[in-house]
Amino acid sequence: MLFRSMLEKPEDILRKFKKAMTDSDACVRFDPENKPGVSNLMQIYSVATGRDYAAIEAEFAGQGYGSFKTAVGESVVELLRPIREETERLLADKSYLESVYRAGAEKAAYVANRTLSKVYKKVGFLAR
């Protein structure tokens, strides 16, 4: 199974695409029934680049799977780059993360105390 995390290093994403399962026929052609691996890669490439299947087939005509898998991997790396960069920026800002944690903890405590007060009233305990 080919798994990609949106936050993986670009070289890891490329390596996984290069290992993607394809068939022995080296023709890049959309045929989900007979070429499911290649067809899946074509779907990914189409989403990442906006190209239709006919354009993809024409682009890689006669090239084999090696260059196609590399192109798919590179297009996914570029598609995910803004997400990865923003995540890295946010994770590097410790004061921002602490403020988010603190705000979340305060909200959770408020909601928990309201719920606990309702439970105390229903059960008949004295309010805290």
Where are these regions (language model features)?
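Conserved nucleotide- and phosphate/pyrophosphate-binding catalytic cores
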Residues: 3-128
